[in-house]
From Swiss-Prot:
Pfam families: ACCA. Acetyl-CoA carboxylase is a heterohexamer composed of biotin carboxyl carrier protein (AccB), biotin carboxylase (AccC) and two subunits each of ACCase subunit alpha (AccA) and ACCase subunit beta (AccD). Gene3D superfamilies: 2-enoyl-CoA Hydratase, Chain A, domain 1. Component of the acetyl coenzyme A carboxylase (ACC) complex. First, biotin carboxylase catalyzes the carboxylation of biotin on its carrier protein (BCCP) and then the CO(2) group is transferred by the carboxyltransferase to acetyl-CoA to form malonyl-CoA. This is Acetyl-coenzyme A carboxylase carboxyl transferase subunit alpha. InterPro entries: Acetyl_CoA_COase_a_su, ClpP/crotonase-like_dom_sf, COA_CT_C. It catalyses: N(6)-carboxybiotinyl-L-lysyl-[protein] + acetyl-CoA = N(6)-biotinyl-L-lysyl-[protein] + malonyl-CoA. It comes from Nostoc sp. (strain PCC 7120 / SAG 25.82 / UTEX 2576). It is found in: Cytoplasm. One of its GO terms (cellular component) is acetyl-CoA carboxylase complex. The keyword Cytoplasm applies.
């Protein structure tokens, strides 16, 4: 995982932090130029900056969490794979003539145990994002994912999926190639696999594109990730014909981790470093690795039949509600 120093990319709600950081730099520079000791004042300002960061990130709105989830420097699937696993080997091709770079997968070792890892992969710059379709997988990508999952099932290797996509690729070509069928096939087949499956939302979890690799025994989610049936912008455009109402849509859609945990859709929230996973990728990766190891240890104690039944029951409960008679 890259740790090189780069100029931070600030989100709009982080501007007060930037102003305070600039003030600290100015005071430090003036003190050096004039030979004045202002270390006490700087310590106070740095403490205030830490407190302000914690205040801001503990009270984020759903639309602000969405900005964090979409941060260009948020750790990607490949970042996490490189940070948490050993002996990673990427496997290519859907065996139908394609190899979608937006959905990657391969074999690795996690804690010394062989696993199959797959996930959506966004780009790090404009050129890379275009090449990877901004993490929006084609039908071939989902077929490649299914091929790797069948490989995992054959050789009794647990499956780890990392979800980070606004949705499946929404093009005419993708529809002609059977986008709906490819995702539906994955949904059906993932329920029948014998091996443990752990799915983690590391950034955006959007629509059927997320579900295509999202059926598992456990569904984990980073604190500032989002998981939704449609992007708030799309929802606002559909319901109100006005994409500017996406903040209201984000609230109504219940896209954030604590809402989804309360609704029983996700199983565990992974805490992020203050400032988001992009502010301290190694700490985020350590949290993810430990959560995966803990959950794998629990799932390994179950028989394949027990896992399949629990997996089925988990998803059957989603969306159940109680109707109150008037």
């Amino acid at each position: 995982m890259a740790t090189t120093e780069r100029k931070p990319l600030l989100l709009d709600f982080e501007k007060p932090l930037a102003e305070l950081a600039n003030r600290i730099d100015q005071i430090r520079q003036l003190a050096e130029e004039n030979g004045v000791d202002v270390s006490g004042e700087i310590r106070k300002l740095e403490t205030r900056a830490m407190q302000l960061r914690e205040e801001i990130f503990s009270t984020l709105s759903p639309s602000q969490r969405l900005q964090v989830a979409r941060h260009p420097r948020r750790p990607s699937t490949l970042d996490y794979i490189q940070a948490i696993s050993d002996e990673w080997m990427e496997l290519h091709g859907d065996r139908c003539g394609g190899d979608d770079p937006a959905l990657i997968g391969g074999v690795a070792r996690l804690g010394g145990k062989p696993v199959v890892i797959l996930g959506h992969q966004k780009g790090r710059d404009t050129k890379d994002n275009i090449a990877r379709n901004f993490g929006m997988a084609t039908p071939g990508g989902y077929r490649k994912a299914m091929r790797l999952m069948e490989h995992a099932n054959k050789f009794s290797m647990p499956i780890l999926t990392f979800i980070d996509t606004p949705g499946a690729l929404p093009t005419v070509v993708a529809e002609r190639q059977g986008a709906g069928e490819a995702i539906a096939y994955n949904l059906r087949e993932m329920f029948s696999l014998d091996v443990p499956i752990i799915c983690t939302v590391i950034g955006e979890g959007g629509s059927g594109g997320a579900l295509g690799i999202g059926v598992g025994d456990r569904l984990l989610m980073f604190e500032h990730s989002v998981y939704t049936v449609a992007t708030p912008e799309a929802c606002a455009a559909i319901l109100w014909k006005d994409a500017s109402k996406s903040p209201q849509a984000a609230v109504a859609l219940k896209i954030v981790s604590h809402d989804l945990k309360n609704l029983g859709i996700i199983d565990q929230i992974l805490p992020e470093p203050t400032g988001g996973a992009h502010s301290d990728p190694l700490t985020a990766a350590t949290t993810l690795k430990q959560a995966l190891l803990d959950n794998l240890d629990e799932l390994d104690r179950l028989t394949s039949q027990e896992r399949r039944q629990l997996r089925y029951d988990k998803f059957r409960k989603i969306g159940v509600f109680t109707e109150v008679a008037h």
